[in-house]
């Protein structure tokens, strides 16, 4: 799959999940995202390795978003499947982000510092956009602390995800041209 299609499908999934959460109707957004993720894994150079990468990233995302929620920094509008965990639509977003590592974000390979900087900037911007679209709200601890922690989470996440990704660079880049 080309980098352009990977980027466009990520964006479509992001908007669908966030707007679905804002209106408490995430079923079709999550279903569509999961269908895309299944297709992405099926088309991967090494499906087993890609599945493992996506699963690790999903666990990281679930843990960090749940922690941010428990710290009172972020309240999700649609808490399904459980108010004790981050919501399923956020899980879909983490999987969508993971699908970009060997696609539209493959150019970040070997650039962990740039990955950290972009994560620290783009992560909080994405969450703020979701809040402004009505999918979540800042908790009683406030927006500034929430954005700072999300920036830290994503500054760690991007280099970590790139480290976890063991796909051969040449194969991943050639596949996406």
Model segments located where?
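Aromatic-rich, lipid-facing transmembrane alpha helices and their immediate juxtamembrane interface loops
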Residues: 1-177
């Amino acid at each position: 799959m080309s980098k352009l299609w990977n980027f466009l499908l990520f964006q479509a999934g992001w908007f669908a999940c966030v707007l679905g959460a804002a209106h408490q109707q995430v079923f079709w957004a999550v279903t569509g995202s999961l269908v895309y993720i299944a297709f992405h894994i099926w088309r991967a150079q090494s499906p087993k390795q890609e599945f493992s990468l996506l699963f690790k990233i999903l666990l990281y995302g679930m843990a960090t978003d749940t922690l941010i929620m428990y710290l009172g920094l972020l309240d999700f509008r649609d808490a399904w499947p459980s108010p004790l965990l981050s919501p399923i639509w956020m899980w879909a977003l983490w999987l969508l982000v993971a699908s970009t590592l060997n696609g539209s974000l493959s150019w970040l390979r070997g650039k962990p510092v740039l990955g950290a900087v972009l994560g620290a900037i783009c992560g909080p911007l994405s969450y703020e956009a979701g809040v402004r679209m009505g999918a979540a709200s800042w908790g009683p601890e406030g927006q500034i602390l929430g954005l700072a922690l999300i920036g830290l989470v994503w500054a760690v996440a991007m280099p970590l995800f790139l480290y976890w990704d063991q796909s051969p660079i040449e194969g991943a880049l050639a596949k996406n041209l």
